[in-house]
């Protein structure tokens, strides 16, 4: 082979090794989950979080960073949102779902999780540490901005309901934090932040299932479901995403088909 032919072959090989061909598909996003025990993996055999099952219904990888006992405030103060921001890459998707542990008042026997009342820039002071505490909406907005700055898109998800049949009659009134996720989304006014009403999706499913079937999903208490209940909650979440219950989200295109319909 002539020297010129050899050099040409080597040059072509170098280009092929270093180029990023247009025909290669873009990197698939990873879904990160931020939440409390209703989303997190549990070591208790009587309960589990829905975040452990959602990967069954998606065609992308899922990283569940939810942890029990956390609120929007404590997840922020403990640096857990920052940890997720350090992990995400541009194009990844993050679901943020809190509310169960945000109740109470920092002004009265503050437990480090309660948020200040209000839906904006209101503040209050912890009666135990002197910490300035902010509202649920404030913490959600700060977390969303942090993650958006890293190139991730954010889905603000309303908290799952408790057992709405616990009294034997249907009680579907949502927690005050359910509409606050939408408030935060609207305040951000960012196309990269969307909202899904997970609470409403699960509520519709519970109405359809009835008191006996729903009661069987709550073994430990009326907040945490069994593994079977967590799986159903994940299916309700995916159905809401796929059917664009509250508009489109970047996760919709990564839902496996056919979609299981649970409500």
Model-derived features: where do they sit?
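Fungal secretory targeting signals
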Residues: 1-25
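Serine-esterase "nucleophile elbow" of acetyl-processing enzymes
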Residues: 20-67, 82-90, 94, 110-116
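Short, solvent-exposed loop/turn segments at secondary-structure boundaries
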Residues: 43-46, 75-76, 167-172
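Acidic helix-start/capping segments at beta-turn-to-alpha-helix junctions
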Residues: 67-72, 164
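Structural motif
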Residues: 71-80
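Alpha-helical cap/lid subdomain in secreted, periplasmic
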Residues: 83-227, 231, 238-250
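Short, flexible loop/turn segments with low-complexity composition
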Residues: 246-262
